[in-house]
């Protein structure tokens, strides 16, 4: 049986991790299990012990740390949060993927210690929307809300430590993006092609229609700029068309993951517009020619 994978879905407090994960867990093709965190904070209205969190005392939490029962833990706004190790390891052995809905501090610990991890950073559309979501909970006073917002400003720059950055402008859009990422990473039973694969086909059409003159000149220049025998041999195998298709696909895909309507990736006019902008921005002379075989993709 194939072992499951830990999936970190992290981001600032109030970004909507719980709402997104709740929807993801409804899809049986994703083989997802939710890792119930341990916390010392008081339950919010409607939260159930053992379902939403394991609510424990400060003493019990400290004991769990000493006994190495937590994969990660962090202290946040006067409370402690951690991920119990036993449940996660059991589910991974069963072939399930386990969502770790954790704060950025805890995610950093896991990324530094665990090799079998897929990491996703969930972004708010803007700071105002983040503040509105936190206030909308109506569970904390203004001082704690300010502390959460201040911490968010320190956490958001750490998004580049994650494999994928996904904006949660609305839950259905964010769920569609994450579902495709999981499919792309080979973690689902979904049989249809990924949006990424379909996007790559659209990009290929556009490159063939509009950019072959550029491609041919690029290949010629690479060969002319080769300085020694090793570089000349590599230049012979340089497939500029394939390289450009993969480069543009990757950039357009990640751009829309970070901001935009995911369904637009299947709109040829939209993709064409994005490619036009990228072609002016990419400095092709700075692209490392060591990747002649497209191995970075």
Swiss-Prot record:
GO molecular function: ATP binding; guanylate kinase activity
The keyword NAD belongs to this UniProt entry's keyword annotation: no
Region (Unknown), start-end ranges: 204-297
Primary location class: cytoplasm
UniProt catalytic activity: GMP + ATP = GDP + ADP
Keywords assigned: ATP-binding, Cytoplasm, Kinase, Nucleotide-binding, Transferase
InterPro entries: GK/Ca_channel_bsu, Guanylate_kin-like_dom, Guanylate_kinase, Guanylate_kinase_CS, P-loop_NTPase
Subcellular localization, as worded in the UniProt entry: Cytoplasm
Pfam families tied to this protein: Guanylate_kin (PF00625)
Function: Essential for recycling GMP and indirectly, cGMP.
PANTHER family: GUANYLATE KINASE, GUANYLATE KINASE-RELATED
NCBIfam families, per the entry: guanyl_kin (TIGR03263)
Family: Belongs to the guanylate kinase family.
Protein name in UniProt: Guanylate kinase
Designated gene of the protein: gmk
């Amino acid at each position: 049986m194939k072992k499951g994978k830990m999936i970190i879905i992290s981001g600032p407090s109030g970004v909507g991790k719980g709402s997104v994960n709740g929807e993801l867990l409804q899809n049986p093709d994703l083989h997802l299990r939710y890792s119930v965190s341990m916390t010392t904070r008081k339950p919010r209205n409607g939260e159930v012990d053992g379902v939403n969190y394991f609510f424990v005392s400060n003493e019990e939490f400290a004991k769990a740390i000493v006994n190495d029962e937590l994969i990660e833990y962090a202290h946040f706004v006067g409370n402690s949060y951690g991920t119990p190790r036993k449940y996660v390891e059991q589910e991974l052995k069963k072939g399930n993927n386990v969502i770790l809905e954790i704060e950025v501090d805890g995610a950093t610990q896991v990324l530094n210690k665990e090799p079998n991890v897929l990491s996703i950073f969930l972004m708010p559309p803007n700071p105002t929307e983040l503040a509105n979501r936190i206030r909308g909970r109506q569970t904390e006073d203004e001082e704690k809300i300010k502390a959460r917002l201040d911490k968010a400003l320190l956490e958001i720059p750490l998004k580049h430590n994650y494999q994928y950055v996904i904006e949660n402008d609305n839950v259905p859009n964010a769920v569609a993006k994450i579902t495709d990422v999981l499919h792309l990473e080979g973690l689902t039973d979904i049989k249809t092609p990924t949006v990424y694969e379909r996007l790559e086909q659209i990009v290929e059409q556009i490159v063939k229609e509009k950019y072959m003159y550029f491609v041919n000149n690029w290949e010629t220049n690479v060969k002319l700029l080769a300085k020694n025998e090793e570089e000349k041999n590599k230049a012979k195998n340089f497939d500029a068309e394939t390289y450009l298709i993969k480069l543009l696909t990757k950039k357009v895909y990640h751009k829309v993951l970070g901001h935009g309507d995911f369904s637009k990736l299947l709109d040829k006019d939209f993709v064409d517009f994005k490619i036009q902008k990228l072609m002016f921005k990419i400095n092709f002379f700075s692209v490392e020619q060591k990747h002649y075989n497209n191995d970075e993709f």
